[in-house]
Every structure is written in structure tokens, then in C-alpha cells.
Design a protein with these regions (language model features):
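Bacterial N-terminal signal peptides
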Residues: 1-7
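Cross-family detector of peptidyl-prolyl cis-trans isomerase
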Residues: 7-144
Length: 144
């Protein structure tokens, strides 16, 4: 009696979500003539004004004003209100990006889906969306 072993090779699964996001981001950067810096995590950013040395850390509380939109220009948050929150409560792309600027600083973040909401859809944000934020860090403080 012979034993037969079946092997299924699933080498060709297509591009990963990370690869798809990076292709979309690179096309967006090229189309909009942007000069971004890319971190190891895949976050792209432009610092317009680093400002002072009071940079937030993971546990800092921040007050920020921002506009958030998708790569196709769909605005999901118009920045009409200030955000007052502990940085640790934000998406990973914000946590990483905002630590690069100080109080009063301004930047652009282009966040791949794994550093945003991933496979979770939000009100105006489809699942696996690359997010773009124009941010101004108004204040950094520690809540006591």
C-alpha cells in the first residue's frame, strides 16, 4: 500500500497589501510632485516646520489641527476642530509621525493601511485605505 503526498504550492499569491499600498503611495508622490522621506515602517512624511524641541512621546497629550483625506482626494476630516488626545490612542502612523516634530510643527503624513485602520472600515474610510494627513501640532503636554 503506497502513501501519496499531495503538495500544494501557493507561491503565487499576488502582491501583499503592504506592496499594494507602497505602489499607490509612490504613484501619489509622483503625481503630486512630492519629496517625502520614508521610514522603515513604510510611513512617508514631509516636515514643513519642525518647530521647537518639545516633541511628543508615546504617552504625551497633544492638541492638533489636521485635515485627513484619501489618495483620491476624498476628505474624511476637514480639520474644522482641534483634536485633544493622548498620542498613544491614535493610529500607529500618527504615533510614529508626530514624534518627528515639535510643538508648533507642521507636516504631511502619508500612512499605509497597516499603520492606519487596516482592514477596518470607518465612516468615510474604506478598509485598507492609505491615509493622507496635513497636520499642525499645536501643543504637547503631560496630563497630571
Amino acid at each position: 500500500m503506497g502513501i501519496s503526498i499531495l503538495s500544494f504550492d501557493s507561491c503565487d499569491k499576488g502582491p501583499s497589501q503592504e506592496e499594494i499600498d507602497q505602489e499607490l503611495i509612490e504613484a501619489y508622490i509622483l503625481e503630486n510632485n512630492l519629496n517625502t522621506t520614508k521610514t522603515e515602517s513604510g510611513l512617508h512624511y514631509i516636515i514643513y516646520d519642525e518647530c521647537d524641541d518639545n516633541h511628543p512621546d508615546y504617552y504625551s497629550f497633544i492638541i492638533a489641527r489636521y485635515k485627513g483625506y484619501l489618495l483620491d482626494g476624498t476628505v474624511f476630516d476637514d480639520g474644522s476642530q482641534e483634536l485633544n488626545v493622548q498620542l498613544a490612542q491614535m493610529i500607529p502612523g500618527w504615533i510614529e509621525g508626530l514624534q518627528l516634530i515639535g510643538e508648533g510643527g507642521e507636516m504631511l503624513l502619508i500612512i499605509p493601511s497597516n499603520l492606519g485602520y487596516g482592514g477596518i472600515a470607518k465612516a468615510k474610510i474604506p478598509e485598507y485605505s492609505v491615509l493622507v494627513f496635513e497636520l499642525k501640532l499645536l501643543q504637547v503636554y503631560d496630563k497630571k
